[in-house]
């Protein structure tokens, strides 16, 4: 029950400016078996925004230019990551903790940007990063998905029909409320 509360809170965090109420510097990572709903939850988060405000980080993103153009997004979602995912570890760590980043741009100068986007990850595998002295695990809230759901070919259509109800309904309010309660509980202190 406590893990569900924290998970809802970190989903709710995606609907606010990343450092508006807390400076935790933590990514939400859904990890586990296939067909457990990891990507569906990230899709739910993405559907809450205008499509222009969502950055999609593909599994085969370029290591040097993977974040080019994403700094204007409100949320960045990386679904179905595999061992081919090659965003540098240092950059992934900086996304979590630094408000300003220097982003490589193809055929242009690096750009120092105010990086405000929240980040959500879903994968079936442990990513290939090294956890030197806890440098990665303290920047991730890992939610382990263990129980597969029956596959539905119309799941996206069903979810799209219900998303309007969810926006007005309990899930959106619950996630935002859980996040605000977390902020009041932890405050600006480091979460770990």
Q: Model features per residue range: what roles?
A:
Residues 1-72, 141-144, 184-191:
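P-loop NTPase catalytic core of nucleic-acid-dependent motor ATPases
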Residues 52-53, 72-74, 99, 115-118, ...:
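Short glycine-/polar-rich loops that comprise or flank the Walker A/P-loop
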Residues 64-72, 103-122:
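AAA+/SF3 P-loop NTPase mechanochemical coupling elements
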Residues 113-116, 132-192:
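Phosphate-sensing "switch" segment of ASCE/P-loop ATPases
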